[in-house]
Design a protein with these regions (language model features):
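Conserved acetyl-CoA pyrophosphate-binding loop and the N-cap/start of the following alpha-helix
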Residues: 86, 90-91
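Acetyl-CoA-dependent GNAT
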Residues: 4-73, 78
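Residue-level recognition of the GNAT/N-acetyltransferase active site
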Residues: 83
Length: 92
């Protein structure tokens, strides 16, 4: 199930970022960034995919809205990752 991420998802986001993206990130930094970025919904979109059985985030996408002179509003994907245990199942 797709849903907005919350501060309670920080542990899963940290783990996915570490193991699937290769970023050795600190849990406190992940929490700080979730707080900051989820409060900026005019520029940042962060959606998680929740495992319906465990209610844990098993994948996420972070995108940023942007404007340019030559087209309407665009969307840059800054991060997209799925827990390797769930890859190949159409999640990402």
């Amino acid at each position: 199930m797709l849903r907005n991420i919350t501060i309670f998802d920080a542990q899963e986001i940290q783990s996915i970022s570490n193991f699937e993206l290769g970023y050795d990130v600190n849990l406190d930094i992940v929490k700080k960034q979730i707080r900051k970025l989820t409060n900026d919904n005019k520029h940042n979109i962060i959606i998680g995919f929740e495992n319906e059985q465990t209610r844990k985030i098993i994948g996420f996408v972070h995108a940023e809205l942007y404007e340019s002179l030559y087209m309407d509003t665009g969307l840059n994907i800054l991060g997209l990752a799925v827990d390797s245990n769930f890859q190949g199942q159409g999640i990402g």
